[in-house]
């Protein structure tokens, strides 16, 4: 746990580095934070922050730059930030000026978000949330070969062949399918994965088959996202190296962004922040990702996000992503004739 003085110094380092993109010297910290202490005390605090992993110093005589841990500490202090009222009014006005069509809203969302954060903004088309189990059927084909038939809500049918260790009769398969129907009917893949159930080896094989089929269906539903602001990101000092430019271009060319920005959990209106090594995808572990879902739970859900270097304007990004996800949720609810899930203040 940092002392109040160490917190002030860390926030000063993060703010200055985000703004200037150069290592922050002790004299700059002293001038910025307004503490009634000497330079030697600042240097001692900086050494302690480095030892505890909050900052990095390329050389002992050089200034400080935030580590992922330092950015995380800083972000945790920004959870309740909001856009200024005038900015909210302007955004609402812009959305009222465009046609009431989803693609118009998505294009406007990434344009507004990228301009505000000066980085690349991404938004996915709202789609049906994870498929839900309607019915499970097991059919004996021969010996230990079994056909798993999965019917999802909306009458989508998936099938897969599996092998049991031993021969199982059709009546035994019916008992297994009845038990799994009782346990899993109406559940999503994520809920099935999280549900604790004492299953025998054959039932576990069926469960694994169900999860595999549902994962394939969920991924098939994904569409390539809308994005804007690549030019803002490439103007950042971090992208003066050709290798970094090639990395981000490959992500776009290989169409991997949809999976990378999809939160690995059920619908959540909160803003999620993944900094550097916190990212699940190895390709973006030198970046920060700020995402939020929008839409109608269990019906139509999309994702809004910002991706950029870890030296990101987190305060602007958090407030903008949060508000735009709320605006889009309201618009999607109106489009579907549903009550909005939040208040558009």
Swiss-Prot record:
GO terms for molecular function: DNA binding. This is Heat-inducible transcription repressor HrcA. The gene is hrcA. Gene3D superfamilies: 3.30.450.40, Heat-inducible transcription repressor hrca homolog, domain 3, Winged helix-like DNA-binding domain superfamily/Winged helix DNA-binding domain. Negative regulator of class I heat shock genes (grpE-dnaK-dnaJ and groELS operons). Prevents heat-shock induction of these operons. Disulfide bonds: none annotated. Keywords: Repressor, Stress response, Transcription, Transcription regulation. Belongs to the HrcA family. GO terms for biological process: negative regulation of DNA-templated transcription. It comes from the Bacteria. InterPro entries: GAF-like_dom_sf (IPR029016), HrcA (IPR002571), HrcA_C (IPR021153), WH-like_DNA-bd_sf (IPR036388), WH_DNA-bd_sf (IPR036390), WHTH_transcript_rep_HrcA_IDD (IPR023120).
């Amino acid at each position: 746990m940092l002392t109040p003085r160490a917190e002030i110094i860390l926030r000063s380092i993060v703010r200055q580095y985000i703004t200037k993109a150069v290592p922050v010297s002790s004299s700059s910290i002293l001038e910025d934070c307004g503490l009634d202490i000497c330079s030697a005390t600042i240097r001692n605090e900086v050494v302690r922050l480095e030892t505890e992993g909050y900052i990095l110093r390329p050389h002992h005589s050089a200034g400080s730059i935030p580590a992922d841990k330092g950015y995380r500490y800083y972000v945790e202090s920004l959870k309740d930030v909001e856009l200024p009222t005038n900015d909210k009014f302007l955004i609402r006005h812009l959305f009222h000026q465009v046609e009431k069509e989803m693609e118009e809203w998505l294009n406007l969302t990434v344009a507004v978000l990228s301009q505000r954060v000066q980085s690349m903004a991404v938004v996915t088309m709202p789609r049906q949330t994870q498929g839900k189990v309607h019915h499970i059927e097991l059919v004996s084909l021969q010996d230990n070969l079994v056909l798993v038939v999965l019917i999802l809500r909306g009458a989508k049918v998936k099938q897969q062949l599996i092998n049991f260790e031993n021969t199982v009769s059709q009546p035994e398969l019916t008992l297994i399918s009845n038990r799994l129907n009782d346990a899993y009917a109406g559940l999503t893949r994520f809920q099935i994965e999280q549900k604790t159930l004492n299953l025998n080896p054959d039932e576990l094989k069926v469960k694994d088959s169900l999860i595999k089929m549902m994962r394939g269906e969920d991924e098939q539903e994904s569409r390539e996202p809308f994005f804007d602001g690549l030019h803002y990101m490439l103007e950042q000092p971090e992208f003066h190296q050709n290798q970094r430019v090639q990395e981000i271009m490959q992500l776009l060319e290989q169409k991997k962004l949809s999976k990378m920005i999809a939160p690995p959990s059920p619908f959540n209106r909160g803003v999620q922040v993944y900094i550097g090594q916190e990212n699940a995808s190895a390709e973006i572990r030198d970046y920060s990702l700020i995402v939020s879902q929008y839409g109608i739970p269990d019906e139509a859900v999309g994702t809004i996000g910002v991706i950029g270097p870890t030296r990101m304007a987190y305060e602007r990004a958090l407030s903008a992503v949060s508000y735009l996800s709320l605006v889009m949720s309201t618009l999607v609810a109106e489009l579907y004739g549903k009550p909005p899930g939040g208040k558009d203040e």
